[in-house]
Amino acid sequence: MSSRRLGVVRPLLQMGLIPQITIGIIAGVLLAVIWPDTAQSVSLLGQLFISALKAVAPILVFALVTAAIANHQQGQPTHIRGVLLLYVIGTLVAAVVAVIASFVFPTELTLELPEVSGNPPGGVVEILRNLLLSAVTNPVSALMEGNFIAILAWAVGLGLMLRQGRDATRQVVNDLSDAISGIVRAVIRFAPLGIFGLVANTLADAGIGALLEYGRLLAVIVGCMLFVALVTNPLIVFLHTRQNPYPLVFACLRGSAITAFFTRSSAANIPVNLNLCDRLGLDPDTYAISIPLGATINMAGAAITISVITLAAANTLGIPVDFPTALLLCVVSSIAACGVSGVAGGSLLLIPLATSLFGISTEVAMQVVAIGFVISVVQDSTETALNSSTDVLFTAAACRSAEVRESA
C-alpha cells in the first residue's frame, strides 16, 4: 500500500515548481467549492508560507547586498542605473494607461459605505520625507520590521566598508549569503502547499459575491494591469533591448507573478524573484540590489489602482477632469506608489492623497478606500503580481541590454 502511494506521489515531487503550483491552485479552488468549511481550516498552510517568506526576506536581502558589494571587483560592471530608469518609466507609463482607460471606460461608485480605518499621508512631500527618514532607521529594527529601504542603506554601507577587509572576512559574508539562499530555496519548495492553502481560504472566506457589485471598476483596474503586463512593459523592454520581449515576459509571469498573486506582498515575493533571477542567469551584483529596491519603488500596479479609483470618485461626484489635472494625477500616482511597498492593500491608503487634487474631502475619500478593500481580493493580488514580476522583467532587460552593448 505504501509503495502504491509512493508511486502516486513521486511524479508530483519530480514535477517542476510551476506545474506543482498549478495543481495547488486547482486543488484549492475545488476544496473551496466542495468543502468550504474544510477550506478555511487549511489556511494555516498559506499563513505559514507567507510568514516564512516574510521572515527570511529581510535577512536575505541584507546578506545578499552586503556580499555583492563587499566582493565587487573594481571595474566590474553593474546595471543598476538602467534598471532604475526602467522602473521610473514603467510606473509612469502604467499611470498614463490607467488615466486613459478611465476616460475611455468611465466608472462610478456607490458612496454609502461605513468608514474604514487608516492614516493616509498628508502629501507627496511627506511621502518623500518618510522615505528618506526610513533609510536611517536602526538596522536591527529595519530587519525586524522589514524596512527594505533601511536594509538596503545599511547593507550598502557595510558592504563598502568590508571591501577594505580581509579576504577571509569577505568569504564569511559570502558563505552566509549562500547559506541563507539555501534556506530560501527550501522555503520556496513549499510554495505549492502554501498557495493551495491561500487559494482555498480566500475563496471560502470572501467568495465572488462581494466582487460582482463593483465588477466594472474591477474590470478597468485588472484590464489596465493586463495591458501593462502584456503590451506596454514588453514594448519598453523591446525598445531597450531590441529583442523579442515575450519569452522573457512570460518567464517572469510564470516564475514570479503566480506566487505574488497569492502572497499579495512584494516583500514576501523577494526570495522568489531572487531565485528566478538566478535561474535566468542574470548578474548577481545587479539583481541582489535591484530586486529588493524594485519591491520598494517599482509600483506600476499601485499607480494604476490609485489613478483608476481616484478618477472613478471624481466621476461619481461630477467633478470635471481636464488634461493638465489628469497629467498631474499620473505624476502624483507614480510618486505616491513608491510609499506602499510590501504592504498588502497599501495602495488604497494613498487614494486620499490623489483625491485631494480634485478637492474631495477625506471623509468621502475614505469611503472610496472602503470600496477598494471590497475588491482587494482581486485588485491587490493582481497589483502585486504586476509589480513583482516587473521587477524581474526590467532587471533582466537592463542586464541583457548591457551584455549586448559590451559584446558589440
Swiss-Prot record:
Cell inner membrane in keyword set: yes
Main location: membrane
Protein name (record): Serine/threonine transporter SstT
GO biological process: serine transport; threonine transport
Domain of life of the organism encoding this protein: Bacteria
NCBIfam families, per the entry: PRK13628.1 (NF010151)
Localization per record: Cell inner membrane
Keyword tags: Amino-acid transport, Cell inner membrane, Cell membrane, Membrane, Symport, Transmembrane, Transmembrane helix, Transport
Purpose of the protein: Involved in the import of serine and threonine into the cell, with the concomitant import of sodium (symport system).
Transmembrane segments: 15-35, 49-69, 85-105, 142-162, 192-212, 218-238, 246-268, 289-309, 317-337, 362-382
Membrane topology summary: Multi-pass membrane protein
A GO CC term attached to the entry: plasma membrane
Signal peptide residue numbers: none
Listed InterPro entries: Na-dicarboxylate_symporter, Na:dicarbo_symporter_sf, Ser_Thr_transp_SstT
Family per record: Belongs to the dicarboxylate/amino acid:cation symporter (DAACS) (TC 2.A.23) family.
Catalytic activity annotation: L-serine(in) + Na(+)(in) = L-serine(out) + Na(+)(out); L-threonine(in) + Na(+)(in) = L-threonine(out) + Na(+)(out)
Organism in which the protein naturally occurs: Marinobacter nauticus (strain ATCC 700491 / DSM 11845 / VT8) (Marinobacter aquaeolei)
Pfam families assigned: SDF
Gene Ontology molecular-function annotations: neutral L-amino acid:sodium symporter activity
